[in-house]
Every structure is written in C-alpha cells, then in structure tokens.
C-alpha cells in the first residue's frame, strides 16, 4: 500500500513540471481496486489517496486489474477501464492461451472517455503496475496481426497505432529487471506458468522510476 505523502509529492512534481492531464494509478501484483478489500485502500491503506487528491483539485483515477494476471492482460484491461468499452484481448492471444476474448463481465463506461492523443494521461504504477504501464505503451504504439494472411486485429487498441496517448509513465519500486518472487508464485500456483509475462524497453514518452 502506498503512503499519501509519497504519492502526493510525485503527483505534484508531475503536474508542476508538465500540465494538468489526468493521472491514472495502476496497482501491482496481488493488488486490488477501490472497495474490493473492505476499508483497506491499496492507495493509502487507512486513507483514500485517490479521493484526497481529487478533493484538492487533482484529476486522479485508479484501475482494478487481475491480481495475478499477465502484463499483457493487465495492459488490455487498463486501456478499456480508462477509455471505456468491451475488453478485447485480441483473437491471436485469446486462441493461443485459450481464454475468452471478450469477457461478458468486463465492459466499462470509462474513467476518462476523452482519452486520446489530444487528451493524454499520466500513468503511475507501483511495483508490477509499472510493467503494466510499459506494456500498455507498447500496445498503444503498435499494430498487431490476427493471422498470417496479414489481417489486422479487429480490436480498436490492437488494430490501430495510438501514439501520443500517454504523457508520462512513473514507476515506483518496479522490478524492471525481473523478480525472484515470480518463480515462487509459479511453483505455488502452477496455472500461472501459462500466463505470458513480458514487457518491452521503450523511451517515449517520459518514464520516471523512483
């Protein structure tokens, strides 16, 4: 769980040095969203950092992702929770890992439906959340094929290059070079061995690591 003072300093620094674009908080491994663990807030513990900052004029949102999902799945879910719409993991990925491409329970109104190149966001990720954000940047900047015949994915995210949608990425205690904890988890939870966990090194937009 993240302390209020630490995150407030980070957010203030981002806004003072850049602009007033919305800030999206992305939790890490075994994390949770608002009101999912009783009165305990992932961002603040006994305090609600998101509410505290919004009450003071900041535009801050937080996403709720699968606690042991892959970077790819978390990035896809982050996109649709921010933009809104039906989560679409893509045809090729869904067939390869035998998952439901468009889960019925994952349709979102959107935390910030205006999100696009003209209305970018800042992403703050704690621990594994930093890798999720970097994967999202990779997906936004790329286009993907659903088959060998050259057809693009039908997914809005995967079938289009959406460059410039992220103003900055700030990572906190993120294992950019991997973590031995993943080996322990995979041995304890065998099903996670089939989850694709990867990320790519990107230099744009601005990436901060603290």
Residue ranges of predicted features:
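Active-site loop signature of alpha/beta-hydrolase-fold enzymes
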Residues: 31-32, 68, 131, 177, ...
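Sec-dependent N-terminal signal peptides
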Residues: 4-13
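Active-site catalytic motif of lipid deacylating hydrolases and related acyltransferases
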Residues: 20-121
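Single conserved hydrophobic/aromatic residue that forms the stacking wall/gate
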Residues: 204-210
């Amino acid at each position: 769980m993240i302390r209020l003072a630490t995150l407030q300093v980070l957010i203030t620094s981002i806004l003072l040095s850049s602009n007033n674009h919305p800030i999206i908080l992305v939790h890490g491994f075994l994390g949770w969203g608002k009101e999912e663990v009783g009165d305990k807030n992932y961002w603040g513990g006994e305090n609600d950092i998101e509410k505290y900052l919004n009450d003071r004029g900041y535009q801050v949102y937080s996403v709720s992702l699968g606690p042991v999902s892959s970077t790819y799945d978390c990035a896809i879910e982050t996109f649709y929770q921010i933009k809104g719409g039906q989560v679409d993991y893509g045809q090729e990925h869904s067939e390869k890992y035998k998952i439901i491409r468009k889960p019925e329970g994952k349709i979102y109104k959107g935390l910030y439906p205006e999100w696009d190149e003209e209305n970018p966001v800042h992403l703050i990720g704690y621990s594994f959340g930093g890798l999720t954000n970097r994967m999202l940047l990779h997906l936004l900047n790329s286009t993907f094929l659903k088959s060998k015949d050259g057809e693009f994915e039908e997914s809005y995210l995967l079938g289009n290059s959406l460059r410039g949608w992220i103003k900055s990425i700030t990572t906190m205690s993120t294992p950019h070079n991997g973590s031995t904890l993943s080996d322990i988890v995979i041995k304890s939870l065998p099903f996670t061995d089939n989850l694709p966990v990867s990320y790519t090194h990107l230099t744009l937009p601005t990436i901060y690591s603290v």
